[in-house]
Amino acid sequence: MEEGPIKKKLKSAGQGSGKTDAFRNFEQFFFRLNTLYTFLICRKHVVPTFKTLCGPIETALKRTVTKEDLAMVMALMPRECVFKYIDENQIYTETKIFDFNNGGFQQKENDIFELKDVDDQNQTQKSTQLLIFEFIDGTMQRSWSASDRFSQIKIPTYTTEEMKKMISKREALFKSRLREFILEKEKANLDPFSELTNLAQKYIPRERDYEDPIEAMMKAKQESNEMSIPNYSNNSVITTIPQMIEKLKSTEFYASQIKHCFTIPSRTAKYKGLCFELAPEVYQGMEHENFYSHQADAINSLHQGENVIITTSTSSGKSLIYQLAAIDLLLKDPESTFMYIFPTKALAQDQKRAFKVILSKIPELKNAVVDTYDGDTEPEERAYIRKNARVIFTNPDMIHTSILPNHANWRHFLYHLKLVVVDELHIYKGLFGSHVALVMRRLLRLCHCFYENSGLQFISCSATLKSPVQHMKDMFGINEVTLIHEDGSPTGAKHLVVWNPPILPQHERKRENFIRESAKILVQLILNNVRTIAFCYVRRVCELLMKEVRNIFIETGREDLVTEVMSYRGGYSASDRRKIEREMFHGNLKAVISTNALELGIDIGGLDAVLMCGFPLSMANFHQQSGRAGRRNNDSLTLVVASDSPVDQHYVAHPESLLEVNNFESYQDLVLDFNNILILEGHIQCAAFELPINFERDKQYFTESHLRKICVERLHHNQDGYHASNRFLPWPSKCVSLRGGEEDQFAVVDITNGRNIIIEEIEASRTSFTLYDGGIFIHQGYPYLVKEFNPDERYAKVQRVDVDWVTNQRDFTDVDPQEIELIRSLRNSDVPVYFGKIKTTIIVFGFFKVDKYKRIIDAIETHNPPVIINSKGLWIDMPKYALEICQKKQLNVAGAIHGAQHAIMGMLPRFIVAGVDEIQTECKAPEKEFAERQTKRKRPARLIFYDSKGGKYGSGLCVKAFEHIDDIIESSLRRIEECPCSDGCPDCVAASFCKENSLVLSKPGAQVVLHCILGHSEDSFIDLIKDGPEPNMPEIKVETVIPVSEHVNFSDDFKIIDVRRATKDDTHTNEIIKKEI
């Protein structure tokens, strides 16, 4: 048989040197590899691991097969092969049984909806990485991912002839590449075999080290500094914002997603002089001696002894106002002290750093003690600060629990206290705001009445307050406040882009995933050196966006940029957050992905762009986030990527509302509640402990009528006044939580490579949705497999894995009344309204594994105990004739109830003081309501609301809603009917706070529900109601809501309020009458 050209070439290449034999052996190895691989893939459908391939080849060749052998094949055919480590959790290693009667190995058919017990599953989910080799040359393309396991397309079984053709085609390509390589190296007078073995070294895969992401970031930055690489690599190429917008339009993924693009013109600076002379030394700490007009106005007002509220835009230099005011007084009065109050420790640390930078430039103040006083301050440091501090940076919690009850140790500080600064005043709202306002009144009372310090002034800042003067008066219990709102700071042009992901092919409603769209945009911004902060409205979106960005960098060969972007949110350890803040501040990160944790004014350096992954919770949040960009007076970009929720799509349709930068009316009223007895009593008890209460003296600090009633009924009296009750002793402030009760924290422990470090802390209420055995927990965009969840010891152990699927919990939440304490009728209706004990039951019964295309690839069962939360709330059972009208009109009942609940919750702030998360309801999930199959879990036709804070006794908010329910429902109905939208929007029945994205909504159904509850006759409104089915929802095939039938028990001391007569269509009132008799 005549020798082929390749064999002739091999002979001439290394006759007598052994090289010919080496290449011949290499050829034989490839033949065996090619044949075995094709057979395994086409007939056995098994994973081609290194171990699986080695055994048969070693038997045939009678030699050891090494990684270098496969790496040499990779070196010749880099585009046709894959040789890498993959995580065992990424693939499915199916157990096979050999059966001669049925043709060999048998593989089990998989049903993705068959629940597998997680305990059994975890026995096979080890963290080992598998080394695989595969051909991806188009002959038999395959990608080993979890989705293969459930592919709906059966992998074909090839005939022997077809397999031979595959083998021959691949071998021909191999020989061609080998021949070309030998010729090229010989032409260069190089040894071909040595060159091939050397080249193969770079193709030998190495197991992933799974380094901690924060450590990886710090290591990369350190190496960059050591190599003297500027942090702003390629920064010489500056992309302007208009250029960046055009570049986005020219990307391959652009398909007319930009629906609106607005430009707010730049603004020049306005300067103004002071009406008095600052201490000359003050100017040593300033970069320039000119003041913006609003800075001068505020400093002048403070000099005249006024209380000041500043509402100019974000990054307009508000901080400098109170910094300079304090420094001037420090220089003029050596005894003066100052208190800076911030809502978070991070913000306090940030402001202390900025303040110290100014002080460091003023020699006369270099010895002034300026420090933070918070929960992290060590005991020995606290004593020193109490005795020596001139300026403290603290938070409301420390004032409440440490400074006020312990005020004797703060005698000197409080006696000389000149200025109290409360930044980010808009944070103090709802229950928390009411608590903090009472703390401020206790502080003012002590300074006035005990330390005779009548010169105390207050200064506050916020860019997003609806009624700033009134809010500040309420917060501090003061009568006069000066408003500074004319902004004199310069700004560059601000560009606002509204981006709507494209509708997917063959879908009428479903759009491209907004997280993936946001990731593509963020990558482009980073590549063009546009320093960006991306805001996400919840933690999970933050992590998923981080994951997508990392994947894009890896897929596009830009692994060098992986450490240039980090995520930042609550739950991360304090040390990790400080490291990320520091790197961002010094310009070492090109982007940061955050929840609203960075919405506050923490200085993280100059930013060019804000990317919003989904619309924020409120218009105030939108303006706070948008204001983070453009801090160097350059042009800035705000780019909003809309999700498919009705709220986001509303702003896509009506973007003009986003331009109302200074329209205070678009912000929520932040009214404070001083009539909530539950809140008020706690602070009066604390105040009595700090200084005995005297009615005439103290009525200016607390509501007079409530003060007298609480003192007489709940406090002890002697000749000195009223003292705290024994129930609150020995330390009343410990009995009063400003934040509605702190939850237990669960530690997330990373056990990868024996690391055993806590990477996050998670609230107990979140664990059911984030930590379950076998689930994927995402941290810094990397997936971690939950190996152990211990609810008793409050920890979870997680291990880093490399998979491209995530897990979505399968859960349900039932909110049900347990006991009736109060019952009343409406003014013009027989429908009863109930108030009493509420039980919320959260059950996670399993989870889906979901690939990056949102396809379900597995279903796993879990056995977590239910989470039960007891609270207080109110509920209204939907009248039966409302159900009948909805059915007659073909309206979805679940959507009707859901829409009515949203409308009522949206109206609550007009009648009671409640934040968006302080009263909650049972939201309707699209997975259930839009299901194809009938569900056994039917829910009663009921509107229900409950206090989310205050524990089993509630916060007192729902009982106030109960008192005002007539006006609330009437106003809710009026708002729906006056709203011009067709299917629901944030102004009527859609809600940004909805946990289910407001997808199950029926605006006309909500009208029916509220009309019927208010007792309106069908004839009076039926013609105004649009017929269904609703165009904003898919075809509804199952009914999930049934009339209320279960009986709710009455409490032993229940009360009937304003009962008019028996209801027409149920037996509730009969039960009431029996109970009353």
UniProtKB/Swiss-Prot annotation:
On induction, the UniProt comment says:
By heat shock.
Chain ranges for the short sequence motif DEAH box as given in the UniProt record: 423-426
Q: Write down the InterPro entries for this protein, in alphabetical order.
A: DEAD/DEAH_box_helicase_dom (IPR011545), Helicase_ATP-bd (IPR014001), Helicase_C-like (IPR001650), HRQ1_WHD (IPR055227), MZB (IPR018973), P-loop_NTPase (IPR027417)
Q: What is its EC number?
A: 5.6.2.4
Q: Gene of origin?
A: HRQ1
The protein's pH behavior is summarized as:
Optimum pH is 6.0-8.0.
Q: What is the protein named? A: ATP-dependent helicase HRQ1
Its Gene Ontology biological processes? error-free postreplication DNA repair; interstrand cross-link repair; nucleotide-excision repair; regulation of telomere maintenance; telomere assembly
Q: How does it assemble?
A: Forms heptamer rings. Interacts with RAD4.
User: What organism is recorded for this protein?
Assistant: Saccharomyces cerevisiae (strain ATCC 204508 / S288c)
Where does it mainly reside? nucleus
Which GO molecular function, any one, fits this protein according to its record?
Answer: telomeric DNA binding
Subcellular locations according to the entry: Nucleus
| Binding-site list for ATP | T312, S313, T314, S315, S316, G317, K318, S319
Specify one Pfam family: DEAD
Q: What's its catalytic activity?
A: Couples ATP hydrolysis with the unwinding of duplex DNA by translocating in the 3'-5' direction; ATP + H2O = ADP + phosphate + H(+)
> What happens when the protein's gene is inactivated?
Leads to increased mitotic recombination and spontaneous mutation, as well as to sensitivity to 4-nitroquinoline 1-oxide and cisplatin. Also causes hypersensitivity to DNA interstrand cross-links (ICLs) and telomere addition to DNA breaks.
Miscellaneous comment: Present with 259 molecules/cell in log phase SD medium.
